[in-house]
Each structure stands twice: as structure tokens, then as C-alpha cells.
């Protein structure tokens, strides 16, 4: 049994871990990874990348011998901490960045890239698999601040299915055993620092039909939703974990409309009464003055707007820019001088 401890934070929803030994990477997996536009590294890293391509769930593998005291902490970085990532670059972390650490140091930037100090190498004998679900906003801000957008961060920032973490790590361990490249150690450590919220909505056919302008029956709506993976419990619709975009009854209406068929929704002209436009007393006065002046032989012209030279400074235009050589008037308004 391996003494492993995870310390969760508000930004980390779930971590699932299993440990394997390293073996050679099969040729077919390397070829499939290349076809997906990625570079094969070694057997363990290839498995994590392969699972990410299959499930859309990023994973990471640590050299367990490099994890001090066998403990993994998921926490915010301390001001001034730094870590060398797998690309060989030293990254200076701020207190708003989530990181993966052991008892002494960061071993990776959570959701972005692992650290070189726990990299899988040829002499690695024990591996720690991590499958996590991090807050997408936090990961996006960290990736932007560090100037590194990775395959993992681009997936996290869009939001992932919380329930997929377990499936991904199980698939990774299945590949380890299936390919005979290691021995899976029993035990999964699952940390859920806060309850996973689920979305439930009330099915209101009248409201949906009023929004869509249709007359779809309740049974048809329920059939569409069930086929899309929603579960029904009376009037309550339970939204599946992978549908993070469904939060309001209008989202349910959209799902119903898409699968009922937009072509089945009747078209009609826009309703309502039209009224003739009018002018305000000031507009009527201006039009009357203009008409009188034109009848007296005057010409009406529309010129370019006058602006103060100070606007160039507001938009930070260089002092030697040729665009500053505009036409100057001899009697500018007082506010422009």
C-alpha cells in the first residue's frame, strides 16, 4: 500500500489516482497519437495522451519516486514559488495559480503542464496517474499569465464532465494491463472537496410551446429529452453531467426545437401595428430654419468634425506620426486650445 494523500482546494473538483509500472509503448498507439497531431513520448505518457484523445479528459503521470513522502497536494501557489515545466522553462508562479505539489515543492502547474522534476524517464519504476477536474476560469487565467496554451489547458478552460475523471483513469489502467506494460496497484484515492451540484429543471410544455410558437405534445418532448441523455422524474428533468450548457428552460426549448426539426416549426409574418414616425419640436424647428435658409439662396454643407489635437495624445499616437499633420483652423474653439 502506498501512503498517498491529496489535499483538495476550491478549484479542484476531483482527483483520482492509480499507480502502474512502466513498460514499452506499442507501435499502434504511437501511430495513432501521431495521426492525431501529437508526439509520442513513452509508454506511460502515450497512454495518458491516448486517453485524453479518447475521452477528452486530460491526465498526467508522475514519477512516484520524485514525489516526496508520497503526498500530492493540490493548492494555490505561494508567492514567489517557481517550477520548471516539461518544456524546460522556469515558470514563476503567483498566488492565484493552482499547482500540484508534494510536501516540499510544486511538481506541476495544475491543468496546464507537469513539472520536469517529476517527469517520466527511462528508469522510472513506479508511476502515479492523476485525473482531475479543475475550474476552467482558473486554468485559463493561469495559462494566459504564463503564456502557455496546452492541449490540457484548452480542454479544461472549456469545462469538462466531472464524472469523466473516474472513467479516464480506469481506461488508462485498463490500457496498462491490456498492453502488458505494467502492474496496476490496487486503490483509488478520490477527493471531492465540495458536493458536485447537479441541474434539475421543470418540464413546462406550455412555456416551451409559447417560446417556440409550436404545439408539441408533452410525450414528444419527453421522448426527445430521454434520447438526448436526460432523465425524467415526473415533471422534473435531470440534466446529465456532461451537459454543462443546459441551465434554463430556454435551453430545454432549444434541445426540443433542434430535434423536433426547425423545418417543422411554422413560419409567420411579424405581428403588431406600425405607426408613422414624427419629429420632436426641436427637430421641426431645425428643419424649418434649414428650409427657410435654402429658400433664401443659401447652401447647406456637411463638413468634417472638428476635434482637439489632444485626442491624438489620448489614443497614444506617436508625436512624429504623419497622421498628426491634419488641417488646422485659425480660430479654434476655446475648448480645443
Language-model region placement:
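Hydrophobic alpha-helical scaffolding
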Residues: 16-23, 38, 86-89, 103, ...
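Flexible, glycine/charged-enriched surface loops at secondary-structure junctions
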Residues: 40-47, 176-191, 233-234, 267, ...
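Short, glycine-/Ser/Thr-/acidic-enriched flexible segments
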Residues: 22, 49, 57-59, 79-81, ...
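Conserved mixed alpha/beta core segments that line enzyme active sites in large multi-domain catalysts
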Residues: 26, 30-35, 42, 48-117
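Extended, well-folded interaction surfaces typified by the phenylalanyl-tRNA synthetase beta subunit core
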Residues: 201-336
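Single conserved hydrophobic/aromatic residue that forms the stacking wall/gate
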Residues: 1-8, 13
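Generic, well-ordered alpha-helical scaffold segments in large soluble proteins
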Residues: 16-20, 32-39, 47-54, 58, ...
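Mobile "lid/hinge" segments at catalytic clefts and subdomain interfaces of large enzymes
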Residues: 100-196
Amino acid at each position: 500500500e502506498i501512503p498517498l494523500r491529496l489535499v483538495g482546494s476550491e478549484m479542484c473538483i476531483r482527483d483520482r489516482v492509480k499507480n502502474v509500472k512502466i513498460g514499452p509503448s506499442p507501435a499502434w498507439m504511437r501511430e495513432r497519437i501521431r495521426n492525431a497531431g501529437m508526439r509520442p513520448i513513452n509508454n506511460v505518457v502515450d497512454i495518458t495522451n491516448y486517453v485524453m484523445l479518447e475521452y477528452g479528459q486530460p491526465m498526467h503521470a508522475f514519477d512516484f519516486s520524485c514525489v516526496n513522502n508520497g503526498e500530492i497536494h493540490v493548492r494555490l501557489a505561494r508567492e514567489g514559488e517557481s517550477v520548471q515545466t516539461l518544456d524546460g522553462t522556469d515558470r514563476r508562479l503567483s498566488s492565484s495559480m493552482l499547482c500540484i505539489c508534494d510536501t516540499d515543492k510544486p511538481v506541476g502547474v495544475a491543468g496546464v503542464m507537469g513539472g520536469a522534476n517529476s517527469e517520466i524517464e527511462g528508469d522510472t519504476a513506479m508511476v502515479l496517474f492523476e485525473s482531475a477536474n479543475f475550474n476552467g476560469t482558473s486554468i485559463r487565467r493561469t495559462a494566459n499569465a504564463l503564456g502557455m496554451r496546452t492541449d490540457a489547458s484548452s480542454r479544461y478552460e472549456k469545462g469538462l464532465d466531472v464524472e469523466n475523471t473516474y472513467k479516464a483513469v480506469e481506461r488508462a489502467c485498463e490500457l496498462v494491463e491490456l498492453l502488458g506494460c505494467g502492474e496496476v496497484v490496487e486503490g483509488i484515492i478520490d477527493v471531492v472537496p465540495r458536493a458536485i451540484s447537479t441541474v434539475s429543471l421543470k418540464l413546462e410544455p406550455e412555456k416551451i410551446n409559447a417560446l417556440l410558437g409550436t404545439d408539441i405534445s408533452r410525450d414528444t418532448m419527453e421522448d426527445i429529452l430521454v434520447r438526448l441523455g436526460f432523465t425524467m422524474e415526473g415533471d422534473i428533468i435531470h440534466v446529465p453531467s456532461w451537459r454543462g450548457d443546459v441551465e434554463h428552460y430556454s435551453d430545454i426549448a432549444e434541445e426540443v426545437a433542434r430535434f423536433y426539426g426547425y423545418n417543422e416549426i411554422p413560419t409567420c409574418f411579424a405581428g403588431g401595428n406600425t405607426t408613422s414616425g414624427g419629429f420632436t419640436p426641436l427637430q421641426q424647428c431645425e428643419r424649418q430654419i434649414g428650409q427657410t435658409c435654402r429658400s433664401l439662396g443659401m447652401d447647406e454643407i456637411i463638413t468634417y468634425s472638428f476635434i482637439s489635437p489632444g485626442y491624438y495624445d489620448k489614443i497614444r499616437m506617436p508625436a512624429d506620426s504623419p497622421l498628426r499633420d491634419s488641417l488646422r483652423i485659425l480660430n479654434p474653439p476655446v475648448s480645443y486650445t
